[in-house]
Amino acid sequence: MTEKRKSPALRFRGYTDDWEQRKLSELTSMHARIGWQNLRTSEFLDSGNYMLITGTDFNDGAINFSTCHYVERERYEQDRNIQIHNGSILITKDGTLGKVAYVQGLSMPATLNAGVFNVQIKDANNVDEKYLFQYLKAPFLMDYVDKKATGGTIKHLNQSILVDFPVILPQRSEQTLIGAFFQQLDNLITLHQRKPLDKSSNLILTGIA
């Protein structure tokens, strides 16, 4: 982005409006399993009716349900803010920081283990979930985190770091087109077993070569 141009040069046909910059905290609320709710490994079940998603279950922007453990109903119901549904956006905050996943194909109730944020969109009429997922999955987020590190190493991605992360928003209908475009691109990449095209994401979302 430049000061003279508030939208990328590469656009979908018919869209000319400027894009706006908002803070992630203005668009979403972020929740994680807090300390007193932490699970012991002895509570992890090999089967059950309530799935437990951890950061190690993230796989190329999705959740590998085959690696997930399960928990008792009481643990699932403990916190509604970390109950996961299809369309949920998740970010790892411990271990490998900043990995992002979009939940699809979930067939049962699910909750989060410690170390993962549930990013909930406040107004679905203003923000498209697939657009936001693709924006967070692009290198912008980790570039921002690296700058916040100021020469050190961030071992935990705290909410205080994420709240001011800038998100560039086109109008809602254009977000939907962009999100769908990248979803199709991801599907093609998966089909051909190639790595995500991070540089292409940067180019199309910013219009900067």
Residue ranges and their predicted role:
Residues 1-20, 165, 171-209:
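Amphipathic alpha-helical segments with low aromatic content
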Residues 25-28, 40-75, 119:
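DNA target-recognition patches
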Residues 54-55, 66-137:
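A short beta-sheet element
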